Every structure is written in C-alpha cells, then in structure tokens.
Amino acid sequence: GIGYEPSISITSNGNMFITAHKDLRWGGEDSPIPIILDPDDPGPWWACTDGRETTWDYWASWFWASYDNGTTWGHGENFGPTPGNMLFANYLAGGSECLGDEGDISVDAMDTVYYLDTTLEDNWWHTLVDHGTEYSTGVCQRMNTMAADDRPWVAAQGDGIIHYLGNSGASPPECTGDSGRYWYYHSEDGGNTFSQCYAVPGGWSTISSQRHGSYVYIAQENADTQSGTVTVRISDEYGRGTGFGDGTWGAPIDVGPREGNCPEGYPVVNNNEGGTVAVVWADCPNGSTGPWEIRFAISYDYGTNWSTWNVSHINGIQMYPFVSISDEDLVSLAFYGLDFDDGGLDGDYVEGEEWFLYAGALQTPVEGDSWDFKIADPEPLHVVTAYEEQSGDVHALHDFFETVLSPDGTWFGIAYQQNL
C-alpha cells in the first residue's frame, strides 16, 4: 500500500501488526472533494475502484497482520475491502469502513491488540483478541476525545488498561490547569471509557508501559523550545491519578540535553518487564541539514538512575531513532541515515544523496558502548532532490518509524518507509 509513518506491535506468540498513514493523494482523482463541489466526482474517499489512481483497499488507515514471523502479510482480521466511496460502498466490511488518517497499535498482557485510528477530529478504537486474530469491537467505536489530535501514541498493559497520548498541538482549556501540546487519556475497561482533561506539560512526547507490570513511562521534551532537556515521567501504578501534578505520576526526571530542534525529533521511550527503560532522540546542533547526533539514555532500575551518552554512527543526518528492548536486556536501535561521507558528492545535504535504514542491537549496553550499526536494506529509502537541497527540506521520510523484538529476542522486525 501507499503510506508512511508506520507503527508496529507484536504479541507474545510473535504475531505482528502494522498500521501506516495513508497518502490522501492516492485516494483517487479529486478525492476527497465533496460531491457538491465536484459534480463529476461520485463522492469522496475512493477506495480501489477501477480506473482510479489508488491503492486503497478500504477507508481506515492501513492495518496489516502477519502470523508467521513476518514471512507473509495481509490485511488484519475484519478489515475487508470497501470499494467505492462514502455514498456507495460496502457497509458490511467491518473495521475498515471507519474512515481514518493515521494510527498506533499496542498489546496488553492478555495478548489483546488495540488499534487506534485517528480522524483528527476524534479517534476510532479497534480491538482484536486471541493474539490479534479475532475482531471484538463494535464497528466504529468512537473514543470521544476532548481535543483534536494529529498523532496518537498508545500503550497497553494488564487486562485492558490503555494509555493514550494525543498530540493536540496546543493547550485547550482543561480540568487540571496544566499546559502542554499532549493530552493523556486513561482507560481500565479495554477502551470503552477514558479519563479526560489531563494535559501533559512539555513538548513532543511518547509513551510506553510494561505489559505485565505496573510501570508507565512518558518521555518528552521539557518544553516546545529550540533547546533544553529530555525528561521522563514515571508512574508505578498504571498511570492512575487525576493529573500530572498529583496521582501516581512522579515529577519529570531530566535524562539528557537537547541541542537544536530537529524536525519531529521527539524522544522515543521503551521498556521491558525487568525494570529496564531507555530513551533515544535526535539532536540538531548544526541545524536540520548539518550533521545530526543521536543521544541515548538507559536505566536498569525502573528509571531511578540513568546513564546518557552520544551514540552517533555517521557524519550526516541520523533521523527518527527508535529503541526496542527484550526482557533479557537486548537493546536494538534503528534510524534513517544520510551519510555525508559515502557518496563522493560535492557538499553535504545535496541532490543525489541517498537515505538508508540503519539498525543494530547490543546486549546490556553501558555508558560509552557503541552499536555496530549496519544498513538493514541495501535499497535507498529516498534520494535527495534538487528542490530538497535548495529548500533544506529533510521531511521526505515523514515523521517516524518503529521496530519490535521477537518474544525470544533472536530477531527484530522493522516497519519503515521506502519512497517510490
């Protein structure tokens, strides 16, 4: 499918699920222009209709599943085709009829898969039980969020405890008086109801939780500023409480500096069941088209003590680093990289430079260790264009990608973007 910004999650038996943002330009001619504005268009939101320029199978954001360690992939359970448009379509197609823009996926301790798909104005929830093989949600279950959302982050744990961070991009009036671009929503009934009103003070953020334990972590920029620090907020009681000034959330802990303001360079947090938690982020001390740095912070005691160091691998742009951790403390890192020294071109960020996917894994890293990164896909993800060189545009691979480690820690899967 044509899409970008993929998210990936894995169940305890190795079933994997990917969602990706759909490119609306591939929705068909004039899509999604309402019929009243374009009489020769039978309606908006076209999906896989003969003679139209589209790869869409359905209206929801992409949702793919693999039940054989990633060897083969297909659409997730109950995500059948919805050919046509919003006026003439298959309304018996299940979850795929719920129009979406982009989403996120998480898995709880019961191996229930939770897929959130945002419509920007609100969100749909899709729940799949039995390692993600059985769709169990009523069609188009609406979340009823209080604020518009541009990017959802989801973490699940226990039996139906769900944490959702919504990027509202602003601080709308809310109940606790906190201010922040992200809002936190909490559910303990599998997403049927959510708490409201809680903004998370700070800048760009991500969230992770233990599946079987009680710990939840939010990594964030301390503020929406050019430079500052990366902080971690911790709850050891499933994120319960009435806000970030009380309840079970501790005060933010500084884990490292931020230098420059990388495009969508938010910190990514992940953890395991044994008390290890790590954060990775990109820094841009030389501007968006100069050499970037990757910083990494890790704690082996539930976030009490931290070690932080620079783990940069190339002289170039190191974008959107992502971290995964096994229960045996195998730590994988991956990033999109553009090496200024590998092409013999005249200049750094210039037309013809190639982006590649880099990945590596390290057992129980300590301060000063280096990952032996390799190019994971020999095919370039993207080649810099003349326009991108002239405008300093480094956004060709969009905002992020994700990885997972297998349950036994012997392999890891990467959901990433490759431009056509």
Where are each of the predicted segments found?
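Extracellular, repeat-based ectodomains that mediate carbohydrate processing or recognition
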Residues: G1-L420
